[in-house]
Amino acid sequence: MTNIGDLLGNAANDLLQSSINVGDVYLLNLDPSNGITPKNDDATRNKFFIVLGFDNEGNVIGGLVINSKINYNLPSTVTDYQLPITVKQCPFLQHNSFVNCSKIIVAKRTKFCKETYRGEISDSKMMKLIIDTVKESPTINRKQLKNFGLI
């Protein structure tokens, strides 16, 4: 039997999924289908996900992940497009980190719920810098930028 808490939880998640905004940050469980490589033989990995845009149907969300540190084993086309982000800018972070602007990660809208919401990038200058860096990244093509309304 469905209880009122379940109904309200579902309604709250439906409402949240219909009001996801560019700059919102979620802690999502991602896997290779999202373009994430899990570590230590794990199947998935929890990553902070910054919403960048939506596909034409609004079902798929494009965004960026936040990494704790830069992996300098990767080519400069990746490492040069890591923007520092501080705990002061994003209080939900446990330590200063880096926004990976070299790769748009894709997630279905159903992954986003009230339990995974962590906050937003409220500094408009920082959000503009993130988007501009994504647009300049040599590893992101125009089709990807267009798919998520970035150009």
Model features per residue range: what roles?
Residues I36-V87:
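Compact nucleic-acid interaction/catalytic patches
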Residues T2, Q82-I151:
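C-terminal terminal-subdomain/extension
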Residues T2-A11:
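Short, structured beta-strand/loop micro-motifs enriched in basic residues and often containing a Trp
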